[in-house]
Amino acid sequence: LADKLTASVKGISPAGVAQLSQFATSIAFLSQGVPFMQAGQEFLRSKNGDDNSYKSNDATNSIKWSTKLKYSSTVNYYKGLIALRAAHPAFRMTTTAAMKANIKFFKGSDTLIAYSINGKAVGDKAKTIVVIHNADTAGAEFTLPNSGSWNILAKGSQIGTKTLQVLKSGKVVVPAQSTMVLKQ
């Protein structure tokens, strides 16, 4: 993923690669179905642009474990993302009928994907979970579907099972090219 991002986004910085890697992976891991990631993706593994590395040497294909320390914030993001998915059955529905009945998508801009999950109906501790993916290069405002307080579980470069912030208002600003997850 890191190589693809580097090749696709002209002039992207290492921090930009990390942010987009977190964003792209959050989309996959917070979707229904079985998520998948490549070995070393959590620490931005690179094969130096070799897109057909099965024929390449060990220097290209080996996992450089030293980069795990260098990109520890991204490693921690992936850990938090996996923990969040594991803690909430709402992200792991097993039938199409359950998904159709309990996921509601909201209309918005072309750069925003937002949906709510009826957690209560699928045995989740959270009554409602809202996931917002903002692909825009600027922050995006979103109006939450229900009144009351919301616990933010993912915002910017932080994600996990612990509440990052309690929100009392009905609107949030989702940082650029990131995912926000809230629960009630």
Task: Cite the ranges covered by each PLM segment.
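Loop/helix patches that line or flank the sugar-binding groove of alpha-linked glycan CAZymes
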Residues: 1-149
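C-terminal beta-strand-rich structural cap/linker in extracellular carbohydrate-active enzymes
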Residues: 164-184
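Short, flexible beta-strand-to-coil junctions
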Residues: 119-120, 135-137, 154-157, 183-184
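Short, surface-exposed, polar/charged, turn-prone segments marking secondary-structure boundaries
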Residues: 64-67, 91, 158-161, 179-181
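Short, polar loop/linker segments at the starts of domains and inter-domain junctions
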Residues: 5-14, 159-171
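Solvent-exposed beta-hairpin/edge-strand motifs
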Residues: 145-159
